[in-house]
Amino acid sequence: EKLADELNGIAYRGRAENSRDTDNLIKFTMEKFGRIDSLLIHVGGPPKGDLLEISEDDWKKANEMVLMPVIRLSKLITPIMQSQGGGSIVNITTFSVFEPSLMFPTSSVYRVGVSSYTKLYSDRYGPENIRMNCLLPGFTDSLDLPEELSQMSVFKRFARVEEQAKTAAFLLSNDSSYITGQSIRVDGGVTRHI
């Protein structure tokens, strides 16, 4: 709520995997502002564990936490953006989209699905001036992470949350009007994929 006040925005508490909460978020925002020009989707970390020891329920929970909110929110926001003549959506996922990690198996599996969905969505709705991109952060200082993970970056440090935020703001803005369907890594060189 404090951040919402600072940004002249709104705060709405809910869970991305709860369709009633996402419906209410969009309704609440439209009632307050009358339009939605951009949407940033960032969900928490799904269950982790050894690959074959993760329960079926945890795999389902990961799907509900990571992929389904993107699909649900897209269905809700697209008609609004169509009526407004366009908009921009950014999905925050992870660097492990390009290089899956056994440290984050469910995240690796379902977040690559978000990148695939993003490409399909941009193919379908790009002609209507609705853009969708993914931001793929590396290890960021807002998380409680072991220091040795910072050494994976060529900069030998964690990303600052402000560095991720500036990239997201760019992708949401008209400054990136010709960028859509992309999965953009902001990982400090952690991934080796070209």
Predicted segments with their positions:
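Active-site loop of short-chain dehydrogenase/reductase
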Residues: 35-37, 81-94, 127-130, 182
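Short C-terminal tail/terminal secondary-structure segment
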Residues: 99, 169, 180-194
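A conserved structural motif in NAD(P)-dependent oxidoreductases
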Residues: 153-164, 175
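Catalytic loop of short-chain dehydrogenase/reductase
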Residues: 90-113, 118-127, 139
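The beta1-alpha1 cofactor-binding region of Rossmann-like NAD(H)/NADP(H)-dependent oxidoreductases
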Residues: 13-24, 56, 162-163
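Substrate-binding pocket helix/loop in short-chain dehydrogenase/reductase
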Residues: 50-52, 58-63, 149
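Alpha-helical segment proximal to the catalytic Tyr-Lys
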Residues: 79, 123-127, 177
